[in-house]
From Swiss-Prot:
InterPro entries: Ferrochelatase, Ferrochelatase_AS, Ferrochelatase_C, Ferrochelatase_N. It catalyses: heme b + 2 H(+) = protoporphyrin IX + Fe(2+). Belongs to the ferrochelatase family. GO terms for cellular component: cytoplasm. It is an enzyme of class 4 (lyase). The gene is hemH. Pathway: Porphyrin-containing compound metabolism; protoheme biosynthesis; protoheme from protoporphyrin-IX: step 1/1. CDD domains: Ferrochelatase_C, Ferrochelatase_N. It comes from the Bacteria. This is Ferrochelatase.
Length: 338
């Protein structure tokens, strides 16, 4: 590399993934890849193969495709949001980092824009440094770790390796907590304050937590910090976990059960925030916003509202870009002194 060339740096913003279409075949392809990852399902491979292929994939894609169709526009909501996040973070970082030839790329763990394909493209263009920002605020072996696995598989195939930074998570970053609190206040300024604010996170099986996955504890820290930022009393908010799958115990309390209990106790108004999601997707727009509203109201509850994810809010873009910028500043210092 000549001294006149700018160091080439690629930033990867990675989310979970989404089907290509809201159709049964597309959903089946996506679910097969997702649910075949041993990071996601920790069941002996042969036993899980039978369950997946005989009891899950023949039935679940039809129900899921119908759910996807209810939230689909011209594309998957998650993919549209991740594209916009990528473009806006790129504009921010280009403005602040003239010293680098800098590119920001979207990636998904599963489905199209897969992390493996993104890394393969980098092989043709040697990089000075690669920064991976998983868009999972709270680390889990079920979500963030598969991205580490992708890099571990890619690294032995490369001769001229780049420097590599992986931003593990940001569950208690002050800008993250502030952005969440501001999103709640902005929503309540328009729609009023409820009796209860529920912070509902995607769940994981309890045995995963027992074996050392820090996810649930990090979710609890996020929720507590948001509640403190909002000056909420203990009886004005709660944390719960949604989307349990199968018959084993998952981390508790369960979102659906808590909402029904509240309704039976006479709680009439609830707003739900899901700080585990950096982009709205099927789970937030259909399960949280629609299914759980029906559960709450059928059990006797009244007003129910889902507060959107941070998505492409300016405070969120500032957070994501800021996380990367801190590493670019360190890289600038390193390159200047080597």
């Amino acid at each position: 590399m000549s001294f006149e060339q700018k160091p080439k740096v690629t930033v990867i913003l990675a989310n979970l993934g989404t089907p290509d279409e809201a159709t049964v075949p597309a959903v089946r392809r996506f679910l097969k890849q997702f649910l075949s990852d041993p990071r996601v399902i920790e069941i002996p491979k042969f036993i899980w193969w039978i369950i997946l292929n005989l009891f899950v994939l023949p039935f679940r894609p039809k129900r899921a495709a119908h759910a996807y169709a209810s939230v689909w526009s011209t594309d998957s909501p998650m993919r549209e949001i991740v594209f916009e996040q990528t473009q806006r973070v790129q504009a921010y970082l280009e403005r602040e980092n003239k010293q680098f030839d800098l590119t920001v790329l979207p990636a998904m763990t599963y489905g199209n824009l897969g992390i493996d394909a993104v890394l393969e493209k980098l092989s043709a263009h040697p990089q000075e440094h690669v920064i991976l920002l998983p868009l999972f605020p709270q680390y889990s072996a079920t979500s963030t770790a598969p991205l580490y696995d992708a890099f571990a598989k890619w690294i032995p195939t490369q001769r001229n390796l780049p420097g590599l930074t992986i931003i593990k998570d940001y569950y208690q970053h002050p800008m993250f907590i502030q952005a969440l609190a501001e999103s709640v206040l902005a929503y309540q300024e328009q729609h009023g304050k409820p009796e209860k604010l529920l912070m509902s996170f995607h769940g994981i099986p309890q045995p995963y937590a027992d074996k050392g996955d820090p996810y649930a504890d990090r979710c609890r820290i996020t929720a507590k910090l948001v509640a403190e930022a909002l000056h909420l009393k203990d009886d004005e908010w709660a944390i719960s976990f949604q989307s349990r799958f199968g018959k084993q115990e998952w981390v508790k309390p369960y979102t659906d059960q808590l909402l029904q209990d509240w309704a039976k106790q006479g709680v009439k108004s609830v707003q739900v925030l899901s700080p585990a999601f950096s982009a709205d997707c099927l789970e937030t727009l259909e399960e949280l916003a629609i299914q759980n509203a029906e559960l709450f109201q059928q059990a006797g509850g009244g007003s129910y509202a889902y507060i959107p994810a941070l998505n492409s809010d300016q405070a969120h873009i500032d957070l994501l870009a800021g996380l990367v910028q801190a590493n670019l500043d360190a890289l600038t210092h390193t390159l200047a002194h080597r």
